Curated annotation (Swiss-Prot):
Residues 293-339, 896-965, 1464-1491 form a coiled coil. This is THO complex subunit 2. One of its GO terms (cellular component) is nucleus. The gene is THOC2. Component of the THO subcomplex of the TREX complex which is thought to couple mRNA transcription, processing and nuclear export, and which specifically associates with spliced mRNA and not with unspliced pre-mRNA. Required for efficient export of polyadenylated RNA and spliced mRNA. The THOC1-THOC2-THOC3 core complex alone is sufficient to bind export factor NXF1-NXT1 and promote ATPase activity of DDX39B; in the complex THOC2 is the only component that directly interacts with DDX39B. Residues 321-341, 1184-1600 are annotated as: Disordered. Residues 1416-1425 have a biased composition (Polar residues). Residues 687-1174 are annotated as: Stern domain. It comes from Callithrix jacchus. The lineage of its organism: Eukaryota, Metazoa, Chordata, Craniata, Vertebrata.
Length: 1600
């Protein structure tokens, strides 16, 4: 009673008379306001009455009080008696159950008190008979019960009996006659009804039988629908509604026998009655068979059977017998004619569809599984017919093709049928819904299929061209989505069930091609992955298609492509997704199937080709496939096969490329570059643009010509018939705006792949991915350049600064993309200017070309400034930078040889055609015409390129003076040129590699101011280790081509003096004195002569050998692979020297042995190079033939034979080399001798050249170094300790035969202490005495190994006594060596490099190597700090010279006097001339120098002062080559007279050299002091010349 307390609280009952009664009445009044029976207030009202009555039963309230209040409440509601009776009914049941007499008595009294409120009749309905008896309402409860049963039986179970004997047959006869009469007259249904009523009454007919007879007649006269429906409506007004439904149900039940067949007329009557709502579908549905659960079971059984068939078809059959069994089973299944059981629900559905009652038909289909009803052909055809009728007006308006008549479809006469569609909007009302219920079974009606497709095509045309309001656009968007759903759920599945209908496939493509490829591919994806599982029929079709595809693919070969292709085409018309999925899976496994499959696809429809493109993309995007092989170093074969197939199939057939291109772009956006392989293949096959690093030189030369020459001679295969396919590719790129995005993504991915893949992937794979990105970018860029028009290119490619700064494109890629745009733009401007003035002269044409170049390139010059920091433009001008990056090989040279070669090929071909007697005359004529036309095109193209190159060269000639600014040193200029121009571009492509080499040569030939060709070549060849190590495989190949072309030029100059004199003799690029003023005058004394150039070339060859050996000995995969590739590329021009070639051969042979089992690819490379190297061994020459070199004197010490750090001379011949290797003792002794001699040579040769090589600052630096010698003495002790560490000679490192010989040679250099002691210049008497003592001690140590040690000590003392005399002799020696025949010539013998590597302690060497590793320059030049250290060391040695064997003092003085007189005369003349030149230069440039800022002066001093040294510092990773001491000995002996080989005579000569060197030192010191005064007084005045002596390029003369 908790709920009762809520409605009627106990307090109300307690205070009933005071307030409770009023509260209760108020509550009931409120609850009675809502009269609804279903509202909550009604239930609360019932609850309140119940609680009040219950309180009376419990005795809390008197029944009089309750009856009074209930009487008052009865006024509130009319239904009060009924509610109160319900309450009494509940209380009656409860009190009976309680069996408490008091409560029962209270209940009886309450009811009796309320009898005036509730009638007896109501109480008799609700209360129990026993309660009624106790209340006195009935006499006996038992009698009451019996009477009630009788009445109910009579009402519900007794039927009125119409006895047929009593019913007269005449009545039924008259009824049938009445219904069967002619109804075309004036008879109406009302009149008919009155007659029927009369007959029923007259003959006492059963009304139900009369209704049944009316239905029978209606069934036989279907044409009078309206009449009978009106009659039945009128008749049913007199009957119960269920009667008609029961009679129909009885009729249907009659035909539900095992062999019964329900007549269609009955279905039609039922359908019409349903349509006119005379019966309810739910009432009739229960009378029909089969039951819904039986239908569901049947559907499931069909799916299970379909899956069973799939399992059978996909089962692996091992024997031929089983195959035969399977074929027999298939035949039996086909023979079975399935007789469907009588399904009354489907029959009624068909009738509903035929009369156009779509709503009731839809309700029936909703009760069944999806597509169950439509899977029955009659139902499907009925739906199709209804759709035909509904879309007829719209199809007649928009779908009928021009010229076609068509067969009109008559509309239904039924007004209740769906309305016909007049517009696309009307299709939404019913038609799309009908298609959804029809599903894949539209296949039964191909005509309707075509109609729907044509309507869809018309809608898409209207949709794409419509510019209506926003509301209309929203409506059309909805219709578009409906068409897409129809295509997904109806059209494509129906096509799968059609029997190879190619026409329907083409018709469907007419609509599909108007969809964007995104919509199409979504539809194909649903078709392939979802649709075939939605219906048992489609499951079977899928299995059968796969089975057939397997059969065809097993038999597909190159020989039977045509018949197999026809079978594939036939199978693809209906089920392309399943077929192509299987074919692609086979291609991924067996790449030899690619060619026959591509050839067999020529019988496909357009839709099938589009589906093929989708299937390819889906196969590529398969997440379950690994894109790398198990070794993680190579791309998987399945991906390579698919890529190859893509290229072939997209080239041969007109397939839409947009989806594939977008897929590649999306993969790049996601940072995945594997799929670039696809793009590479597609571009190669479709456009004929081939990217390979294995191009021959003939092909490479052809690639520098015009487009025709490229096509004929630039590729491995003949490029034929690519015009259409390349046009298709171009259109796809432009239509979807993918041209530039793909380029930018590739360029960004190229740089990003290193960081994205670097940590996880193998270095070899990362390199391949980088190369793939780069190669595809180059290939794609070439395609765009050759196929896009000027307007398209300019419209799509932004300016260079936008590309680099906004899109973050690397500079090399940005210029690569922009270069064709500049060329197109210049060409179009030039053509415009030519047209404006026709018939102008050649000079005017050149002028116009230059004008057009300026117009196009001026904005580019401004744009490139933002690409680098402002400091860069102090070294090179933006114009030079832009010119370098904008030109190509096509602009620089004409490949006459290639043109001639291709023309000759055509001539031979024409001759072969003439000689061919079997060829038909017509074909012969056509072929000859083709060859002649091609020949004319080539000749015309050659002429056009010749004119173009002439114009370009004229332009460059005018521009060259502004290219390189004189604001910075030539060393820095070359650094920036190499760093920003040469190195980035030479590894971009093979043609760019050739271009870079030719451009350097061109800049040299143009006599470009401020450009040092010598320095440029030296920086390129000096140290290639880091460049090679940082390259990928393809970049190494390109870098090798670049070095090959550079070596070709150098070798041409080296091989012939006349060529050298002609091309280099008077060129500013070969000046050895570098001037900061920009004046590169042709002073012959400043030029490098031919012999010294040959020394320099030998040095370069030695440097290449040293770098190669270093890379080969590292053991690193990348180092070894890349250096082998580079060496293979430069093989035509290197090695030329026999001992260098032998050194390389030994190292490569070692690689072959070591890598044979470990790394097969390195082994293959090494073996290939080794074989080629051996084949060129006959072309190698000894070193003395390569550059001029005197044979060594018989008794010469090692110091004469070897340069500092050079190899022992015994290695120059085979026998001496063998003796060195066989005898360890002899090797050690010769090394000690050579090192003791080397220290003296080093001191002498490091004096003046070090000062000269410092480019202007050397004088002051040397002077300061001499003054600071006292400070250095403390450091010398530490240095002596370091010098004790083992140092390896260069020959031991570079040219050692094997690893076992190295430890023998890597011993401490004992004479380092002696050298360090001698390098200290004595300043006082005490110091001299100390110096002498140290010299004695150290000389005694080496007495056993050096025969002339005592003579050294005496000579040292002699030098200390006469320092001024030695300086005079040095000066004389300088004048002797520099004056030949009246003109100044630089002599390498007097110039010396810094300390060799073998003399540098190990820690110091590591420091230098680390500095070089971190140096920003591409050529790895040294830092200023290192250079200054070496300058100090060399300056400290300024007054220390050779220590030859002693001579008698008298002889020495006599010879000294003679030499001194001669040298003084020459030195006076030289001083006068130098002073005069210096004054002139000072007067010419004093104004300019005053304007130079002090910080710039300082920077120039520092940078130029180290220029000469920097080259040696760059050699630190390996042993630096230094001047040949034999050549020096030769030069020195010429200046001091002839000698015949004795030790004393040799000592006399060396003494002269040392004294001559000191004289030169004093002469240089005077110049330095003058310059220091000038610097300290002026402050702003800059030095005018920077001596760039040959020590920078001096070579090792070490024997190999």
């Amino acid at each position: 009673m908790a709920a009762a307390a809520v409605v009627v609280p106990a307090e109300w009952i307690k205070n009933w008379e005071k307030s409770g009664r009023g509260e209760f009445l108020h509550l009931c009044r409120i609850l009675s306001e809502n009269k609804s029976l279903e509202s909550s207030t009604y239930r609360d009202f019932q609850q309140a009455l119940y609680e009040l009555s219950y309180h009376v039963i419990k005795g809390n309230l008197k029944h009089e009080q309750a009856s009074n209040v209930l009487n008052d409440i009865s006024e509130f509601r009319e239904d009060m008696p009924s509610i109160l009776a319900d309450v009494f009914c509940i209380l009656d049941i409860e009190t009976n159950c309680l069996e408490e007499k008091s409560k029962r008595d209270n209940f009886t009294q309450l009811v009796l008190a309320c009898l005036y409120l509730v009638s007896d009749t109501v109480l008799k309905e609700r209360l129990d008979p026993e309660t009624l008896e106790s209340l006195g309402l009935i006499k006996q409860s038992q009698q009451f019960n019996q009477k009630s049963v009788k009445i109910k039986t009579k009402l519900f179970y007794k039927q009125q009996k119409f006895n047929l004997l009593r019913e007269e047959n005449e009545g039924y006869a008259k009824l049938i006659a009445e219904l069967g009469q002619d109804l075309s007259g004036s008879i109406t249904s009302d009149l008919m009804l009155e007659n029927i009523k009369s007959l029923i009454g007259c003959f006492n007919l059963d009304p139900n039988r009369v209704l049944d007879i009316i239905l029978e007649v209606f069934e036989c006269r279907p044409e009078h629908d309206d009449f009978f429906m009106s009659l039945l409506e009128s008749y049913m007004s007199m009957c119960e509604p269920q009667t008609l439904c029961h009679i129909l149900g009885f009729k249907f039940k009659f035909y539900q026998e095992p062999n019964g067949e329900t007549p269609s007329s009955l279905y039609r009557v039922a359908a019409v009655l349903l349509q006119f709502n005379l019966i309810d579908l739910d009432d009739l549905y229960v009378h029909l068979l089969p039951a819904d659960n039986c239908i569901m079971d049947e559907h499931k059984r069909e799916i299970a059977e379909a899956k069973q068939i799939v399992r059978k078809l996909t089962m692996v059959v091992l024997s031929s017998e089983k195959m035969d069994d399977r074929e027999k089973e298939k035949e039996k299944e086909e023979e079975k004619v399935e007789r469907p059981p009588d399904n009354q629900k489907l029959g009624l559905l068909e009738a509903l569809l035929k009369i156009g009652d779509w709503q009731h038909a839809q309700n029936i289909m909703d009760q069944m599984p999806p597509y169950y009803a439509a899977s029955h052909k009659l139902i499907a055809l009925a739906i199709c017919k209804l759709i035909h009728i509904t879309i007829e007006p719209l199809y007649r308006r928009v779908g009928v093709p021009k010229g076609a008549k068509g067969s009109p479809v008559n509309a239904l006469q039924n007004k209740r049928a769906p309305k016909q569609a007049e517009s696309f909007e009307d299709l939404r009302r019913d038609v799309f819904n009908m298609f959804c219920y029809l599903g894949p079974h539209l296949s039964h009606d191909p005509i309707l299929f075509a109609k729907v497709v044509r309507i869809g095509k018309s809608f898409m045309k209207e949709f794409q061209s419509d510019g209506s309001k926003q509301e209309d656009k929203e409506k059309t968007e909805v219709i578009l989505s409906c068409f897409l759903s129809t295509a997904d759920q109806v059209l494509l599945p129906s096509l799968s069930l059609m029997d190879c209908n190619a026409c329907m496939s083409e018709e469907l493509w007419g609509m599909f091609k108007t969809f964007p490829y995104q919509y199409r591919y979504r539809l194909y994806g649903q078709w392939k992955n979802e649709t075939y599982n939605s219906h048992p029929l489609l499951v079977k079709v899928k299995a059968q298609t796969i089975d057939r595809a397997k059969y065809i693919m097993k038999r597909l070969t190159k020989e039977n492509v045509k018949p197999s292709g026809r079978q594939i085409g036939k199978l693809s018309h209906s089920n392309p997704t399943i077929l192509f999925d299987y074919i692609l899976s086979q291609i991924q496994k067996y790449d030899n199937l690619i060619t026959p499959v591509v050839d067999s696809l020529k019988y496909l429809t357009s839709l099938n080709y589009d589906v093929l493109a989708y299937c390819i993309i889906e196969a590529l995007a398969n997440p379950e496939k690994e894109r790398m092989k198990h070794d993680d170093t190579t791309i998987s074969s399945w991906l390579q096969s698919l890529a190859s197939f893509c290229g072939a199939v997209f080239r041969k057939y007109p397939i839409d490329l947009a989806g594939l291109l977008q897929y590649v772009a999306n993969q790049l956006k996601a940072g995945k570059s594997f799929d670039l392989l696809i793009l590479k293949e597609v571009v190669q096959k479709m456009a004929g643009i081939e990217i390979t690093e294995e191009m021959t030189m003939e092909q490479l030369e052809a690639m520098t010509g015009g487009e025709q020459l490229k096509a004929e001679g630039g590729y491995f295969g003949q490029i034929r018939n690519t015009k259409k396919s390349s046009q298709r590719l171009k259109d796809a790129l432009l239509d979807h705006d993918l041209a530039l995005p793909l380029c930018l993504l590739m360029a960004q991915q190229r740089n990003g792949v290193i960081f994205q893949e670097g940590g996880e992937k193998h270095l070899k794979l990362v390199g391949k991915l980088y190369d793939q990105c780069h190669d595809t970018l180059v290939q794609f860029g070439r395609f765009l350049a050759s196929n896009l028009s000027t307007e398209d290119y300019i419209k799509r490619v932004p300016s260079i600064d936008v590309l680099c700064n906004e899109f973050h494109t690397p500079h090399d890629a940005a210029f690569f993309l922009s270069r064709p745009m500049y060329a197109h733009h210049i060409s179009s401007k030039y053509d415009e200017l030519k047209k404006s003035e026709k018939g102008s002269k050649q000079q005017h044409k050149v002028h116009k070309y230059i004008t057009s170049c300026e117009m196009v390139m001026a904005p580019v010059h401004e744009a490139v400034v933002s690409l680098h920091v402002s400091k860069v433009w102090d070294d090179i001008s933006p114009q030079f930078y832009a010119t370098f990056w904008s030109l190509t090989m096509y602009d620089l040279a004409v490949p006459h040889t290639s043109y001639e070669r291709e023309v000759n090929k055509l001539k031979i071909q024409m001759k072969a055609i003439d000689d061919n007697q079997e060829m038909p005359p017509n074909k012969k004529k056509k072929e000859k015409e083709r060859c002649t036309a091609l020949q004319d095109k080539l000749l015309e193209e050659e002429k056009k390129q010749m004119e173009h190159v002439q114009r370009v060269l004229q332009r460059l000639k005018l521009e060259k003076d502004n290219w390189l600014l004189a604001k910075s040193t030539k060393n820095e200029t070359i650094t920036k040129f190499l760093q920003l121009c040469i190195f980035p571009r030479c590894i971009f492509s093979a043609i760019d590699a050739v271009y870079c080499a030719r451009f350097v040569e061109l800049v040299h030939q143009q006599k470009t101011p401020n450009f040092s060709t010598l320095l440029c070549y030296d920086r390129v060849f000096s140290d290639i280790i880091y460049t090679v190590a940082s390259c990928t495989e393809n970049e190494a190949s390109r870098y090798g081509r670049f070095l090959c072309c550079m070596l070709e030029t150098v070798t041409r100059w080296h091989s012939d003096r006349a060529t050298y004199e002609k091309e280099c003799g008077n060129y500013p690029g070969f000046l050895t004195i570098l001037r900061a003023t920009g004046f590169d005058g042709g002073n012959k004394a400043d030029q490098l002569d031919y012999e010294n150039f040959r020394h320099v070339v030998h040095k370069w060859h030695y440097k290449l050998t040293k770098a190669s050996v270093h890379c080969l000995e590292t053991g690193e995969y990348t180092h070894i692979r890349n250096i082998l590739i580079v060496l293979t590329k430069i093989l035509p021009w290197y090695p030329k020297v026999l001992n260098l070639g032998q050194a390389l051969e030994r190292r490569v042979h070692k690689i072959c042995q070591e890598e044979k089992e470990k790394r097969p690819d390195l082994y293959a490379l090494a073996m290939g190079y080794s074989g080629q190297l051996k084949s060129r061994k006959s072309y190698m020459i000894p070193e003395n033939e390569f550059h001029h070199k005197d044979p060594p004197p018989r008794n010469a010490v090692a110091s004469v034979q070897n340069g500092p750090g050079g190899g022992p001379s015994s290695s120059s011949t085979g026998s001496s080399s063998k003796s060195d290797e066989s005898s360890t003792e002899e090797t050690d002794k010769s090394r000690e001798r050579s090192q003791c001699g080397v220290k003296a040579v080093n001191k002498a040769s490091n004096t003046t050249p070090k000062g000269n090589s410092s480019n202007g600052n050397s004088g002051s630096n040397s002077n300061k170094a001499v003054k600071e010698n006292d400070k250095e003495k403390g450091k010398e002790k530490e240095k002596e300790k370091k010098e004790k560490t083992p140092a390896t000679t260069p020959e031991a490192r570079v040219l050692g035969k094997d690893g076992k010989e190295k430890p023998k040679e890597e011993r401490p250099n004992k004479d380092e202490k002696a050298r360090e002691t001698k390098e200290r210049t004595p300043k006082s008497d005490k110091e001299k005495e100390k110096f002498k003592k140290e010299e004695k001690v150290k000389d005694e140590k080496f007495k056993t190994t050096i025969p002339n040690a005592e003579s050294k000590s005496s000579q040292e003392r002699e030098r200390e006594k006469e320092p001024s005399r030695e300086r005079d002799i040095a000066k004389e020696m300088k004048s002797k060596e520099n004056v030949k025949g009246g003109e100044k010539t630089p002599v390498s013998g007097s110039l010396k490099s810094p300390v060799p590597r073998s003399d540098i302690p190990e820690p110091e060497r590591e420091q230098k190597r680390r500095k070089i590793d971190t140096h920003p320059s591409p050529s790895h030049s040294s830092t200023v700090k290192d250079s200054l250290i070496e300058l100090k060391e060399s300056s400290a040695k300024l007054y220390v010279n050779h220590t030859p064997a002693p001579l008698s003092k008298s002889k020495e003085r006599e010879m000294d006097k003679k030499d001194l007189d001669k040298s003084r005369e020459r030195s006076r003349e030289r001083e006068k001339k130098d002073e005069k030149d210096r004054k002139e230069r000072k007067r010419d440039h004093s104004n300019n120098d005053r304007e130079v800022p002090p910080d710039l002066i300082k920077r120039r001093k520092e940078e130029n002062g180290t220029m000469g040294v920097s080259k040696h510092k760059s050699e630190s990773p390996c042993e630096s080559p230094y001047p040949n001491e034999k050549d020096k000995e030769k030069n020195k002996s010429k200046s001091s007279g002839k000698e015949k080989g004795s030790d004393s005579f040799k000592s006399e000569k060396m003494d002269k050299i040392s004294s001559g060197g000191k004289k030169e030192s004093r002469h240089d010191k005077e110049k330095i002091e003058k310059k220091e005064k000038r610097d300290s007084s002026g402050g702003k005045e800059e030095k005018k010349q920077y001596p760039f002596h040959l020590d920078v390029f001096s070579q090792y003369n070490g024997k190999l």
